[in-house]
Amino acid sequence: MDRLAAMDAFIRVVDAGSFSGAASQLRMGQSAVSKAIAQLEERIRVRLLLRSTHGLTPTEAGRIFYERAKRSVEEAEEAEFGARGAVTTLSGRLRIHATVAFGRLCVLPRLPGFLAQHPALDVDLVIDDRNIDLVETGIDIGLRAGQLSNSTLTARKIAQCQRRVIGTPSYFNTAGVPQSPADLMAHQVIIYEQPLRGPTWSFRQGAAEVSVHLGGRVRLNSAVGVRACVLADLGLAVASEWMFAPELEAKTVKPVLTDWLLPPVEAWAIFPAGRQASAKARAFASFIETQMSIGGNMPSVRE
């Protein structure tokens, strides 16, 4: 087994927690996988795995090697895909899952361009805020904005966007414009409830950092709902520029406290665990990544 294949085998062993799980993914014998890892450890003269009755876990050196090996394997796959893409016509059906706000604001407006590039390809787009099982539902690629809740997913970051404190001019005319993060505690804040994100936010300005616990009368578990509440003048929100791109461009909402930085929000392409992403899925991820890097303002799908 060559070095890159051995690195891929090691990655799959760590992800699966066993030689048998990795062997099943690679469609090869368990003994062959075990031998490949042993040869890899011998080659680099470092123990990568701890073997016990509870399974296999990476050593400290193994964890470092895992991260670097994963990047190397992904880069090699991207190089192969790029070479194939130059001569291969994509065809068949691509199944995409996207969350509602991200799908509506960031994916749908760009879909015509992707379909124009690949006339032999059909697309099924599932727009849903639930965390669905990609394998069980036959999804080729999922698109998420924000922190990923499942660390075992095969994921690729495709974009990053600044968060802002955003409200309508009408709301600010009534409630006043906050001059500091602490002033937000006196405002109605539309709270977007997420599993990994509470209502406390850290604002940075140079070396200064201020944490503020935000509160308000309205809480939602939907980004689309947060948009609707802000546009209805019910309050302000901490939100990505993506979420309000059309309104920011039209100046029907405005950002405040712009000299303070909030943690950015990241967009991810995720692929079914345990198998290599298809050429169609990788092509779509690359397309969205390129499109979102062109400019901060994105077109919207009007109702």
What annotation goes with each model-predicted range?
Residues T53-L56, R63, E74-H97:
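Short helix-loop hinge/linker segments at domain boundaries
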Residues L40-E41, V253:
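Conserved amphipathic alpha-helical core elements
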Residues E67, A120, E241-K254, W260-E303:
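C-terminal effector-binding regulatory domain of bacterial HTH transcription factors
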Residues T152-R163, G167-I190, G206:
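Flexible hinge/capping segments at coil-to-helix
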Residues E41-P58:
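A short LG(V/I)-centered, amphipathic sequence patch enriched
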Residues S91-T154, V301-E303:
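Central regulatory/effector-binding core of bacterial HTH transcription factors
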Residues R12-R27:
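Short helix-boundary/capping micro-motifs
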Residues G29-A32, A36-Q39, R110:
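Residues within the DNA-recognition helix of helix-turn-helix
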